[in-house]
């Protein structure tokens, strides 16, 4: 890979967004461009994530101020990204969803666990972003332009069986 890719995280003040930010700050091919939070807009990242003090000078911006990037990570509550898909998908060619919005392909199964899906027409677009190899006890991220990241329950059991 040549050059760094710019990355922005929507919902970076939460646990999943904060952990993704922590990892991205150390990645040799990523440059974190923006992080959003409505509640903490204008505050430095370390105000919410003290473990990142001295690692970045980024400040939270409101989602409305989000600029285009190469990669957009969405760490929003379940259902929010799906409802605002058109807005966010226009900002980056690569989307990584940390919520449950696009983990399941079957709208009936989604309804069973999360309620009615706001955009069932998009369920087939996202790739489940982790492949687990139970024989080797490992996993790998698969490349795609729209990734649905599994929760811990989806990855951990095969690794420890």
What feature does the model see in each segment?
Residues 1-161:
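N-terminal Rossmann-like NAD(P) cofactor-binding subdomain of oxidoreductases
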């Amino acid at each position: 890979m040549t050059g760094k890719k710019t990355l922005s995280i929507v919902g970076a003040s939460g646990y999943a967004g904060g952990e993704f930010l922590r990892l991205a700050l150390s990645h040799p091919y990523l440059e974190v461009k923006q992080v959003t939070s409505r509640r903490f807009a204008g505050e430095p990242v370390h105000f919410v994530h003290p473990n990142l003090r001295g690692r970045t000078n980024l400040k939270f911006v409101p989602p409305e101020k989000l600029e285009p990037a190469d990669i957009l990570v969405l760490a929003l509550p379940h259902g929010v990204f799906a409802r605002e898909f058109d807005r966010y998908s226009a900002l980056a060619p690569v989307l990584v969803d940390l919520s449950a919005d696009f983990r399941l392909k079957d709208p009936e199964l989604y309804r069973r666990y999360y309620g009615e899906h706001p955009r069932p027409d998009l369920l087939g677009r996202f790739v489940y972003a982790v492949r687990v190899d139970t024989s080797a006890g490992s996993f790998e991220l698969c490349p795609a332009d729209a990734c649905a990241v599994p929760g811990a329950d989806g990855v951990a059991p095969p690794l420890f069986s």
